[in-house]
């Protein structure tokens, strides 16, 4: 059986006025279901770029110049944007360092969780709301049945990051890409 995630000879480039900057060159890895892979490196080594490339969120002008990314054997680095969006929500969850980039300030966290759940899972809004409350509880949000109707700005940084983690888990993805998910949390919460 193919691995859950297979990355082969990934090369990420940025065109500049002075020529091409190769930011990541020849990254390969394979992740089996249930396996955890930690990527360690100096600041600027390309860890975040690699994660962004895997989930199809590489900021232009950055581009995958070579290599391939496969999810359960299916090539995903060449998918059109709309198709990749479906993969990102349903099959791959993402947790970033800054929770404010992952949450829409105009919608309650409940609205965002329910939308993610109903978009990717065959579930009614009321069932999705129950699941959203369970997710908030499982990530350590106190009084989730009340906090579900709060807006992102009404949560502390640490609590916002827990909401982002709940959002990443909402559609029951096969794979989660987490880029320093606990940076915004204090040390006692990081340990949890």
Model segments located where?
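The feature captures the beta-strand-to-loop junction immediately N-terminal to the Walker
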Residues: 40-41
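Conserved signature/switch motifs of ABC ATPase nucleotide-binding domains
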Residues: 89, 153, 170-171
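A short, proline-enriched helix->beta-strand linker immediately N-terminal to the Walker B motif
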Residues: 170-174, 190
């Amino acid at each position: 059986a193919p691995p859950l995630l297979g990355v082969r000879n990934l090369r990420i480039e940025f065109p500049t006025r002075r020529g091409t900057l190769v930011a990541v060159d020849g990254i390969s890895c394979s992740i089996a279901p249930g396996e955890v892979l930690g990527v360690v490196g100096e600041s600027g080594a390309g860890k975040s770029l690699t994660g962004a490339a895997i989930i199809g969120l590489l900021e232009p002008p950055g581009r995958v110049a070579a290599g391939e990314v496969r999810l359960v054997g299916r090539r995903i680095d060449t998918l059109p944007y709309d198709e990749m969006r479906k993969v990102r929500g349903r099959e791959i969850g993402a947790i970033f360092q800054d929770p404010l980039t992952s949450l829409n300030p105009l919608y309650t966290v409940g609205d965002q969780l329910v939308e993610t759940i109903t978009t990717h899972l065959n579930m009614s809004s009321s069932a999705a709301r129950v699941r959203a409350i369970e997710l908030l509880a499982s990530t350590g949000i106190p009084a989730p049945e009340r906090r579900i109707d709060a807006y992102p700005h009404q949560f502390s940084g640490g609590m916002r990051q827990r909401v982002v983690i709940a959002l990443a888990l909402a559609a029951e993805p096969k794979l989660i890409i987490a880029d320093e998910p606990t940076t915004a949390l204090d040390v006692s919460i990081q340990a949890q």
